[in-house]
């Protein structure tokens, strides 16, 4: 006793219709990180003019995973209480969002370690905008590869 052709086609259609290609892009972690970045950059975050390592400038041999690893290393500066800059000490809401961002970006990272060159610096504002741009590109790429 096998499947009738009609039943096999119906089951196949159900299988296809539940895929992401039909329902649109659903990369929750990336979408949540981008939303958090939007909130942090829209709020007029304190310390936006402070300097952080410019780790998001890709060289020819830099992979996307390496950029994300470096970004997570920079964001760790806001995670541990001993490293928090004075301008964020009393801004628990913004600090919470930056910590959430650190956890999210670290979760995207598949590399165990990466080097951060601290010889070139950028403002926190420019760093967050660059990170947002990279992650939006990654999000769009993940959406188009599903369809």
Swiss-Prot record:
Pfam families reported for this sequence: IL4
Disulfide cysteine pairs (residue numbers): 47-87
Lineage per the UniProt record: Eukaryota, Metazoa, Chordata, Craniata, Vertebrata
Domain of life of the native organism: Eukaryota
Subcellular localization(s) per the UniProt record: Secreted
Protein name: Interleukin-4
GO molecular function: cytokine activity; growth factor activity; interleukin-4 receptor binding
UniProt similarity note: Belongs to the IL-4/IL-13 family.
Encoding gene per record: Il4
Residues that carry a glycan: 61, 90, 117
The entry's keywords: B-cell activation, Cytokine, Disulfide bond, Glycoprotein, Growth factor, Secreted, Signal
Function of the molecule: Participates in at least several B-cell activation processes as well as of other cell types. It is a costimulator of DNA-synthesis. It induces the expression of class II MHC molecules on resting B-cells. It enhances both secretion and cell surface expression of IgE and IgG1. It also regulates the expression of the low affinity Fc receptor for IgE (CD23) on both lymphocytes and monocytes. Positively regulates IL31RA expression in macrophages. Stimulates autophagy in dendritic cells by interfering with mTORC1 signaling and through the induction of RUFY4.
InterPro entries: 4_helix_cytokine-like_core, IL-4, IL-4/IL-13, IL-4/IL-13_CS
Gene3D superfamilies per UniProt: 1.20.1250.10
Signal peptide (from-to): 1-24
Electron transport recorded as keyword: no
């Amino acid at each position: 006793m096998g499947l009738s052709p009609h039943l096999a086609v119906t089951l196949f259609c159900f299988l296809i219709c539940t895929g992401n290609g039909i329902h649109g892009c659903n990369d929750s972690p990336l979408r949540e990180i981008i939303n958090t970045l939007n909130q942090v950059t829209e709020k007029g975050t304190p310390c936006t003019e402070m300097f952080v390592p410019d780790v998001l400038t890709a060289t020819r041999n830099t992979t996307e995973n390496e950029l994300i690893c470096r970004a997570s290393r920079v964001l760790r500066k806001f995670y541990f209480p001993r490293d928090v800059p004075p301008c964020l000490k009393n801004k628990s809401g913004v600090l919470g969002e930056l910590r959430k961002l650190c956890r999210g970006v670290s979760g995207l990272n598949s590399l165990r370690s990466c080097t951060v060159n601290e010889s070139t610096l950028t403002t926190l504002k420019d760093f967050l905008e660059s990170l947002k741009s990279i992650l939006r590109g990654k999000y769009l790429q993940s959406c188009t590869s599903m369809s």
